[in-house]
Regions:
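Basic/polar low-complexity intrinsically disordered segments
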Residues: 1-227
Protein backbone atom coordinates (compact mmCIF):
# COMPACT_ATOMS: atom_id res chain seq x y z
CA UNK A 1 0.00 0.00 0.00
CA UNK A 2 1.25 3.47 -0.89
CA UNK A 3 0.16 4.63 2.57
CA UNK A 4 3.28 2.94 3.96
CA UNK A 5 5.46 5.22 1.85
CA UNK A 6 4.31 8.24 3.84
CA UNK A 7 5.07 11.73 2.55
CA UNK A 8 7.62 10.32 0.12
CA UNK A 9 4.69 9.26 -2.05
CA UNK A 10 3.75 12.70 -3.35
CA UNK A 11 2.83 12.61 -7.05
CA UNK A 12 1.74 15.71 -8.96
CA UNK A 13 -0.72 13.77 -11.08
CA UNK A 14 -4.17 14.09 -9.51
CA UNK A 15 -5.41 10.61 -10.44
CA UNK A 16 -2.63 8.81 -8.54
CA UNK A 17 -2.60 10.93 -5.40
CA UNK A 18 -3.37 8.99 -2.23
CA UNK A 19 -6.83 10.50 -1.74
CA UNK A 20 -7.78 9.73 -5.36
CA UNK A 21 -6.53 6.14 -5.03
CA UNK A 22 -8.49 5.63 -1.81
CA UNK A 23 -11.64 7.02 -3.40
CA UNK A 24 -11.22 4.80 -6.47
CA UNK A 25 -10.66 1.78 -4.23
CA UNK A 26 -13.95 2.47 -2.45
CA UNK A 27 -15.81 2.89 -5.73
CA UNK A 28 -14.30 -0.32 -7.13
CA UNK A 29 -15.15 -2.33 -4.00
CA UNK A 30 -18.73 -1.05 -4.09
CA UNK A 31 -19.09 -2.00 -7.75
CA UNK A 32 -17.80 -5.51 -7.02
CA UNK A 33 -20.16 -5.93 -4.07
CA UNK A 34 -23.09 -4.80 -6.22
CA UNK A 35 -22.03 -7.25 -8.92
CA UNK A 36 -21.85 -10.13 -6.42
CA UNK A 37 -25.35 -9.27 -5.22
CA UNK A 38 -26.63 -9.10 -8.80
CA UNK A 39 -25.05 -12.49 -9.55
CA UNK A 40 -26.69 -14.02 -6.48
CA UNK A 41 -30.07 -12.52 -7.39
CA UNK A 42 -29.76 -13.86 -10.93
CA UNK A 43 -28.81 -17.35 -9.73
CA UNK A 44 -31.73 -17.37 -7.29
CA UNK A 45 -34.15 -16.21 -9.99
CA UNK A 46 -32.94 -18.91 -12.39
CA UNK A 47 -33.26 -21.59 -9.71
CA UNK A 48 -36.78 -20.43 -8.87
CA UNK A 49 -37.77 -20.43 -12.54
CA UNK A 50 -36.33 -23.91 -13.07
CA UNK A 51 -38.38 -25.14 -10.13
CA UNK A 52 -41.57 -23.54 -11.45
CA UNK A 53 -41.11 -24.90 -14.98
CA UNK A 54 -39.91 -28.38 -13.98
CA UNK A 55 -43.41 -29.98 -13.74
CA UNK A 56 -44.63 -28.45 -17.03
CA UNK A 57 -43.64 -31.29 -19.38
CA UNK A 58 -45.44 -33.95 -17.34
CA UNK A 59 -48.41 -31.63 -16.85
CA UNK A 60 -48.98 -31.05 -20.58
CA UNK A 61 -48.76 -34.81 -21.12
CA UNK A 62 -51.55 -35.27 -18.58
CA UNK A 63 -53.54 -32.50 -20.22
CA UNK A 64 -53.26 -34.17 -23.61
CA UNK A 65 -54.17 -37.59 -22.24
CA UNK A 66 -57.17 -36.07 -20.49
CA UNK A 67 -58.32 -34.59 -23.79
CA UNK A 68 -57.83 -37.88 -25.63
CA UNK A 69 -59.87 -39.63 -22.96
CA UNK A 70 -62.78 -37.28 -23.68
CA UNK A 71 -65.13 -37.24 -26.67
CA UNK A 72 -62.96 -34.81 -28.63
CA UNK A 73 -62.42 -35.46 -32.33
CA UNK A 74 -59.25 -36.92 -33.79
CA UNK A 75 -58.59 -33.67 -35.66
CA UNK A 76 -58.91 -31.66 -32.44
CA UNK A 77 -56.47 -34.01 -30.71
CA UNK A 78 -53.95 -33.58 -33.52
CA UNK A 79 -54.19 -29.80 -33.33
CA UNK A 80 -53.56 -29.86 -29.59
CA UNK A 81 -50.78 -32.41 -30.00
CA UNK A 82 -48.85 -29.98 -32.21
CA UNK A 83 -48.58 -27.51 -29.34
CA UNK A 84 -47.98 -30.24 -26.77
CA UNK A 85 -45.01 -31.54 -28.75
CA UNK A 86 -43.45 -28.08 -28.75
CA UNK A 87 -43.80 -27.95 -24.98
CA UNK A 88 -42.24 -31.41 -24.67
CA UNK A 89 -39.29 -30.72 -26.98
CA UNK A 90 -35.66 -31.36 -26.07
CA UNK A 91 -32.45 -29.55 -27.00
CA UNK A 92 -29.96 -31.26 -29.30
CA UNK A 93 -27.26 -30.21 -26.84
CA UNK A 94 -27.25 -28.76 -23.35
CA UNK A 95 -27.55 -24.98 -23.27
CA UNK A 96 -24.52 -23.24 -21.82
CA UNK A 97 -24.61 -19.92 -20.05
CA UNK A 98 -23.62 -16.66 -21.74
CA UNK A 99 -20.76 -16.35 -19.23
CA UNK A 100 -19.34 -19.74 -20.26
CA UNK A 101 -19.90 -18.91 -23.92
CA UNK A 102 -17.86 -15.70 -23.59
CA UNK A 103 -15.04 -17.54 -21.83
CA UNK A 104 -14.88 -20.11 -24.63
CA UNK A 105 -14.94 -17.41 -27.31
CA UNK A 106 -12.07 -15.60 -25.55
CA UNK A 107 -10.10 -18.83 -25.94
CA UNK A 108 -10.84 -18.88 -29.67
CA UNK A 109 -13.47 -21.61 -29.40
CA UNK A 110 -16.52 -20.93 -31.55
CA UNK A 111 -19.77 -21.90 -29.86
CA UNK A 112 -22.71 -23.00 -31.97
CA UNK A 113 -25.89 -23.49 -30.01
CA UNK A 114 -28.59 -25.15 -32.05
CA UNK A 115 -31.97 -25.69 -30.47
CA UNK A 116 -33.89 -28.73 -31.71
CA UNK A 117 -37.17 -27.29 -30.50
CA UNK A 118 -38.83 -24.23 -29.07
CA UNK A 119 -37.58 -24.76 -25.56
CA UNK A 120 -36.58 -21.26 -24.56
CA UNK A 121 -38.56 -20.16 -21.56
CA UNK A 122 -40.20 -17.34 -23.51
CA UNK A 123 -41.51 -19.75 -26.12
CA UNK A 124 -42.67 -22.24 -23.50
CA UNK A 125 -44.73 -19.55 -21.79
CA UNK A 126 -46.12 -18.51 -25.16
CA UNK A 127 -46.94 -22.06 -26.23
CA UNK A 128 -48.52 -22.85 -22.88
CA UNK A 129 -50.74 -19.80 -23.35
CA UNK A 130 -51.66 -21.02 -26.83
CA UNK A 131 -52.51 -24.42 -25.39
CA UNK A 132 -54.79 -22.90 -22.77
CA UNK A 133 -56.50 -20.69 -25.36
CA UNK A 134 -57.09 -23.68 -27.61
CA UNK A 135 -58.40 -25.85 -24.77
CA UNK A 136 -60.85 -23.12 -23.79
CA UNK A 137 -62.50 -23.51 -27.22
CA UNK A 138 -62.87 -27.28 -26.89
CA UNK A 139 -66.18 -28.11 -25.23
CA UNK A 140 -65.13 -31.70 -24.57
CA UNK A 141 -62.17 -30.64 -22.42
CA UNK A 142 -63.78 -30.55 -18.99
CA UNK A 143 -61.60 -32.53 -16.54
CA UNK A 144 -62.60 -33.19 -12.95
CA UNK A 145 -58.99 -33.04 -11.75
CA UNK A 146 -58.37 -29.64 -10.17
CA UNK A 147 -54.81 -29.32 -11.49
CA UNK A 148 -56.01 -29.87 -15.08
CA UNK A 149 -58.89 -27.39 -15.03
CA UNK A 150 -58.58 -24.28 -17.18
CA UNK A 151 -58.64 -21.83 -14.27
CA UNK A 152 -55.79 -23.70 -12.58
CA UNK A 153 -53.82 -23.72 -15.82
CA UNK A 154 -54.35 -19.98 -16.25
CA UNK A 155 -53.05 -19.37 -12.73
CA UNK A 156 -49.99 -21.46 -13.54
CA UNK A 157 -49.42 -19.52 -16.75
CA UNK A 158 -49.44 -16.26 -14.78
CA UNK A 159 -46.93 -17.74 -12.32
CA UNK A 160 -44.64 -18.92 -15.12
CA UNK A 161 -44.78 -15.53 -16.82
CA UNK A 162 -43.78 -13.78 -13.61
CA UNK A 163 -41.05 -16.31 -12.86
CA UNK A 164 -39.58 -15.83 -16.33
CA UNK A 165 -39.86 -12.05 -16.02
CA UNK A 166 -37.91 -12.11 -12.76
CA UNK A 167 -35.02 -13.84 -14.52
CA UNK A 168 -35.09 -11.31 -17.36
CA UNK A 169 -34.99 -8.41 -14.89
CA UNK A 170 -32.22 -10.07 -12.87
CA UNK A 171 -30.27 -10.67 -16.07
CA UNK A 172 -30.53 -7.00 -17.04
CA UNK A 173 -29.37 -5.96 -13.57
CA UNK A 174 -26.45 -8.40 -13.76
CA UNK A 175 -25.44 -7.11 -17.18
CA UNK A 176 -25.62 -3.48 -16.04
CA UNK A 177 -23.57 -4.18 -12.93
CA UNK A 178 -20.99 -6.09 -14.94
CA UNK A 179 -20.64 -3.18 -17.38
CA UNK A 180 -20.31 -0.76 -14.47
CA UNK A 181 -17.59 -2.95 -12.91
CA UNK A 182 -15.74 -3.13 -16.21
CA UNK A 183 -15.92 0.63 -16.71
CA UNK A 184 -14.50 1.32 -13.25
CA UNK A 185 -11.74 -1.26 -13.53
CA UNK A 186 -10.78 -1.28 -17.19
CA UNK A 187 -11.53 2.12 -18.75
CA UNK A 188 -8.58 3.64 -20.55
CA UNK A 189 -6.75 6.26 -18.46
CA UNK A 190 -9.46 6.59 -15.78
CA UNK A 191 -9.86 2.89 -14.95
CA UNK A 192 -8.38 1.33 -11.81
CA UNK A 193 -5.98 -0.88 -13.78
CA UNK A 194 -4.46 1.97 -15.81
CA UNK A 195 -4.22 4.18 -12.74
CA UNK A 196 -2.50 1.37 -10.83
CA UNK A 197 0.07 1.08 -13.63
CA UNK A 198 0.67 4.84 -13.48
CA UNK A 199 1.13 4.64 -9.71
CA UNK A 200 3.67 1.82 -10.10
CA UNK A 201 5.62 3.87 -12.64
CA UNK A 202 5.68 6.83 -10.23
CA UNK A 203 6.94 4.61 -7.39
CA UNK A 204 9.63 3.28 -9.72
CA UNK A 205 10.70 6.84 -10.55
CA UNK A 206 10.87 7.87 -6.89
CA UNK A 207 12.52 4.84 -5.30
CA UNK A 208 14.29 3.23 -8.26
CA UNK A 209 13.77 0.03 -10.22
CA UNK A 210 15.77 -2.12 -7.76
CA UNK A 211 14.34 -0.61 -4.59
CA UNK A 212 12.41 -2.71 -2.05
CA UNK A 213 9.52 -0.27 -2.40
CA UNK A 214 9.16 -0.84 -6.13
CA UNK A 215 9.70 -4.59 -5.81
CA UNK A 216 6.82 -4.63 -3.34
CA UNK A 217 4.36 -3.13 -5.84
CA UNK A 218 5.88 -4.67 -8.97
CA UNK A 219 4.65 -8.07 -7.80
CA UNK A 220 1.07 -6.83 -8.04
CA UNK A 221 -0.49 -8.05 -11.29
CA UNK A 222 -3.37 -6.26 -12.97
CA UNK A 223 -5.16 -7.94 -15.85
CA UNK A 224 -6.31 -5.61 -18.61
CA UNK A 225 -9.54 -6.01 -20.53
CA UNK A 226 -11.16 -4.12 -23.39
CA UNK A 227 -14.31 -2.30 -22.30
Amino acid sequence: SVIAFGQTYNPSKESIKLSALQNLQTVAKNSLNELYIAQANYSNAVAARDKDFEPLTKLVTRIFNSLRASDSSEQTDKTVQTIVRKLQGRRASAKISEEDKKLLEEQGIEVNQISASQMSFDSRVENFGRLISLLSTIREYNPNEEELKLETLKELQTKLKQSNKEVVLASISLSNNRMNRNTILYSKISGLVDIAFDSKIYIKSVFGATSPQFKQVSRLYFKTRTV
